[in-house]
């Protein structure tokens, strides 16, 4: 998800849809967690545009996620350590830690890390322009601490929330700490703010079924499927 031209939230395979110019304008990447579908494009992105930029690309994530990237991707075995090249004092990549509750302010926009409940350390993000807010839950299952915070966001306009499994796979959703439509309905019942709700993280082979079940279980909240290249103004 691209915020304006310079902030990216997660870096999955969809980043490949961006042009070289668009990639080069991104200064900050806020990661929700370390799973491959959320970090896969970072190595190629840094390698592609690092030499075109006059400052490092900054990765923001919880300490556990940054440690995984250092140890398992940017380790010289899988990919070069771009936090050390071309030189340690002028690298292509730099790491910055963020914890739940921390807010980073970038050109009057605020990015705040939200609690997530997943199988690895993870966060969601609250993006606040000052005029409006968008909440992206990231990968999560049942998450009461999230709603306690979201319900205090007075200018909330959009909520993007995952639903990774259909109802017949509820047990798998519980084990893997995701949501299915019946669980989504239980979570949305905790939302006390008015917001447009969009569904993400749908499995490609189950999109139609899952969205049908979402309509049946949570239709009163009017959730819609997040579309490629969808634009939100806030």
Regions found by a protein language model. Give the residues of each.
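Divalent metal-coordination and catalytic microenvironments
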Residues: 1, 10, 33, 69, ...
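Active-site beta-strand termini and strand-to-loop segments that position acidic
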Residues: 1-5, 106, 126-130
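Active-site neighborhood of phospho(di)ester-bond hydrolases with catalytic His/Asp-centered motifs
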Residues: 9-12, 27-37, 60-62, 135-140, ...
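Metallo-beta-lactamase
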Residues: 64-122, 130, 220-233
């Amino acid at each position: 998800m691209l915020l304006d031209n310079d902030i990216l939230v997660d870096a999955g395979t969809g980043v490949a849809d961006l042009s070289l110019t668009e990639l080069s304008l991104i200064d900050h990447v806020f990661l929700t967690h370390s799973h491959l579908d959320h970090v896969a494009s970072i190595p190629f992105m840094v390698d592609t545009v690092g030499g075109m930029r006059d400052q490092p690309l900054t990765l923001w994530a919880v300490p556990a996620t940054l440690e995984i990237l250092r140890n398992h991707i940017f380790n010289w075995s899988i990919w070069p350590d771009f936090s050390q090249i071309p030189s340690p004092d002028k690298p292509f990549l730099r790491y910055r830690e963020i914890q739940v509750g921390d807010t980073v302010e970038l050109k009057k926009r605020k990015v705040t890390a939200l609690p997530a409940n997943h199988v690895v350390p993870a966060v969601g993000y609250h993006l606040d322009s000052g005029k409006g807010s968008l909440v992206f839950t990231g990968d999560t299952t049942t998450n009461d601490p999230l709603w306690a915070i979201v319900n205090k966001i007075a200018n909330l306009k959009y909520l993007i929330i995952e639903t990774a499994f259909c109802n017949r796979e509820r047990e798998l959703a519980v084990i893997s700490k995701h949501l299915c439509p019946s669980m989504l309905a239980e979570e949305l019942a905790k939302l006390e703010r008015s917001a447009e709700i969009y569904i993400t993280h749908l499995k490609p082979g189950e999109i139609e079924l899952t969205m049908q079940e979402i309509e049946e279980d949570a239709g009163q909240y009017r959730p819609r499927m997040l579309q490629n290249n969808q634009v939100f103004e806030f």
